[in-house]
UniProtKB/Swiss-Prot annotation:
HAMAP family: DNA_mis_repair (MF_00149)
InterPro entries: DNA_mismatch_repair_CS, DNA_mismatch_repair_MutL, DNA_mismatch_S5_2-like, HATPase_C_sf, MutL/Mlh/PMS, MutL/Mlh/Pms-like, MutL_C, MutL_C_dimsub
Assigned protein family: Belongs to the DNA mismatch repair MutL/HexB family.
SMART domains to which the protein is assigned, alphabetical: DNA_mis_repair, MutL_C
Keywords: DNA damage, DNA repair
Protein's UniProt name: DNA mismatch repair protein MutL
Gene source species: Actinobacillus succinogenes (strain ATCC 55618 / DSM 22257 / CCUG 43843 / 130Z)
A single GO cellular-component term on record: mismatch repair complex
Biological process, per Gene Ontology: mismatch repair
């Protein structure tokens, strides 16, 4: 068969295989189009799980008559126009494939009216018949899209649809996810003529919490800890729950990047790592998190359904989220969650149902509403801040049962709690990164090496400089050593602690700068201990910036040998103890360190050799103090 260009209808159906997986995929694409059009009220009508009818109605800006047919063409969009727009996307849609793909596998009717038109206009297409005519219709300002008989011309795809209940369950989950991120938008979801979900517009704090409770449950709100974590152009906000609210299944994990719901491995790994000490492998954390960053630093054009993103600096994002969630969990341990703050009655909100047709949005060009980049608004008047220490705030979460989350500092409500009208736009002004800056950042990402002679192990003689020969690794817990005719056991945990103590007591302990500084807010008792212990922290290789007035310290650098440890846990635990001497400080520090397992003999011998090299630089500690003599003579006689 010769190479040939596929007909447009066939190309659309192939694209539909990626975009239109099931009725929920259609709902997602059409609702996101309504959001891009500036709608404040969206109604979703479903019949028979979406197989018979999907109707999305909004009060957005509408589509002009002359663009109505073009809206159904492939790669026709109002969201982007240049490659620069593609690299700074904040709208949900941008490819112009959804309507063309959906219309190729269904009977689609598109009705729309703009505010400056006297009447609405309607276009109808079905399946492979892509030719359409525009006819007048009756419709308020906004757009209605009806998708009937999904996969009517593709029986093979239609027979793979599940039951109506299952398909509607997927649609319900899509609306839940979108409603969490768009609290100021009103959503109504019906199935077979019955209202199933009705999320009213949430502007005030209590209304937003009520929507959160309606979607995630009252127990989630009772255990929720609010996060407002910032660093330069990164902002993490939302809710994480205490470890006691861990789930048996991963059904309450919602993550958004610049308002777009995603399933990202980097973000999920950072959150799982923050909960690692509290949850087992078979339990899952519950969270609703919003990550906002410069759109130039994230690529959303990497997946057909836009569920995945790719970060330009994934390690920075990972560490930022990990420290934000970890800090919230550690701070929560200092507060009592049984305090009563607000009753369920105070949380009840009764707002009248607004007239759907009376909501008229402000008239703006369609492309500006869809693809507007808030990060570039008012950039000439914005003052760029540099070297701003990272801050985190926790806010009380009113609960329906009278319980509450924690609060560390009285402050203004976070952006996601504030009404949309009162929320100021704070663009992420960012200059173009030069090659020199990229090279400097690459150097920062490199882990400095401790200057020491090579510790490679000769396979013919696993030995150390003190004539100790490594014979075997015993249960991954000890080294069996031989010196002349004598045998010894060397516990690996004691060996690793000796190595760390030697590194921490060096005159110039090698340091590792943190990509993201860690901020600690101290109680009065912790502040008193900080004044006692700060000299010991400095001698061990920690580097802090102190703010005594606000009882705040910022950790900027750590000893290189502790760079993989849970720094928040270690620092807080030390400041919660009363220590009077340097020796007790080091002992307490080493007790908090998590020691890695040694499952390979060569790795254990490397640790032994490095320890012996460090022992040669001092005279107070001896390796022989750790050796346990083993007498084999009774077994050999």
């Amino acid at each position: 068969m010769p190479i040939q260009i596929l007909p447009p209808q066939l190309a659309n159906q192939i694209a539909a295989g990626e975009v239109v997986e099931r009725p929920a995929s259609v709902v997602k694409e059409l609702v996101e189009n309504s959001l891009d059009a500036g709608a404040t009220r969206i109604q979703i009508d479903i019949e028979n799980g979406g197989a018979t009818l999907i109707r999305i109605r909004d009060n957005g800006f509408g589509i002009p008559k002359e663009e109505l047919s073009l809206a159904l063409a492939r790669h026709a969009t109002s969201k982007i126009a240049t490659i620069d727009d593609l690299e700074a996307i904040l709208s949900f849609g941008f490819r112009g494939e959804a309507l063309a793909s959906i219309s190729s596998v269904s009977r689609l009717t598109l009705t729309s009216r703009t505010a400056d038109q006297q009447e609405a206009w309607q276009v109808f297409v079905q399946g492979r018949e892509q030719e359409s005519t525009v006819n007048p219709a009756s419709h308020p300002v906004g757009t209605t899209v009806e998708v009937a008989n999904l996969f009517f011309n593709m029986p093979a795809r239609r027979k793979f649809l599940r039951t109506d209940k299952t398909e509607f369950g997927h649609i319900d989950e899509v609306i839940r996810r979108i409603a969490l991120a768009k609290s100021h938008i009103a959503f109504t979801l019906t199935h077979n003529g019955k209202i199933v979900r009705q999320y009213k517009s949430a502007v005030e704090d209590t209304q937003k919490l009520k929507r959160l409770a309606a979607i995630c449950g009252n127990d989630f709100v009772r255990q929720a800890l609010y996060i407002d974590w910032k660093h330069d152009n990164l902002h993490l906000s939302g809710w994480v729950t205490t470890p006691t609210f861990a789930r048996q299944q991963n059904d309450l994990s919602y993550c958004y990047v610049n308002g777009r719901m995603v399933k990202d491995k980097v973000i999920n790994h950072a959150i799982r790592q923050a909960y690692a000490e509290h949850l087992g492998s078979e339990r899952y954390p519950a969270f609703v998190l919003f990550l906002d960053l410069n759109p130039n630093d994230v690529d959303v054009n990497v997946h057909p359904t836009k569920h995945e993103v790719r970060f330009q600096q994934s390690r920075l994002i990972h560490d930022f989220i990990f420290q934000g969630v970890t800090n919230a969990l550690l701070s929560a341990e200092q507060f009592d969650f049984s305090a009563s703050t607000e009753s369920e009655k105070n949380n009840e909100i009764r707002e009248p149902q607004a007239d759907y047709q009376n909501v008229t949005p402000t008239i703006r060009p369609n492309r500006a509403a869809a693809g507007q980049n808030m990060f570039e608004l008012n950039s000439p008047t914005q003052t760029k801040q540099t070297n701003v220490p990272i801050t985190t705030k926790a806010y009380p979460t009113p609960a329906h049962s009278g319980q509450a989350g924690y609060s560390t500092t009285p402050s203004n409500p976070p952006p996601h709690f504030m009404p949309q009208s009162a929320r100021s736009v704070s663009p992420f002004e960012r200059e173009k990164v030069t090659k020199t800056e990229q090279r400097i950042y690459a150097e920062l990402l490199k882990t400095p090496e401790v200057e020491a002679p090579p510790t490679s192990i000769q396979s013919s003689l696993l030995s150390s400089s003190s004539l100790l020969h490594a014979v075997a690794l015993v249960n991954n817990q000890a080294l069996l050593l031989q010196r002349d005719t004598a045998f010894y056991l060397l516990p690996l945990n004691k060996l690793q602690k000796m190595r760390l103590e030697l590194l921490l007591t060096l005159p110039n302990t090698p340091q590792q700068m943190l990509l993201i500084p860690v901020v600690f807010r101290l109680s009065d008792k912790q502040q008193a201990q900080w004044r006692q212990q700060k000299i010991w922290f400095e001698q061990s290789g920690f580097e802090f910036i102190e703010n005594p007035v606000q009882h705040r310290i910022t950790l900027n650098a750590v000893p290189q040998c502790l760079r993989h440890q849970n720094l928040q846990k270690i620092v807080i635990a030390l400041l919660n103890r009363s220590l009077q001497k340097t020796e007790k400080f080091l002992t307490a520090l080493l007790d908090l360190v998590e020691l890695p397992d040694c499952q390979v003999l060569a790795n254990a011998v490397n640790i032994l050799q490095e320890t012996e090299l460090l022992l040669d630089q001092q005279t107070t500690m001896k390796l022989d103090n750790l050796l346990i003599p083993i007498d084999f003579s009774s077994y050999l006689s």
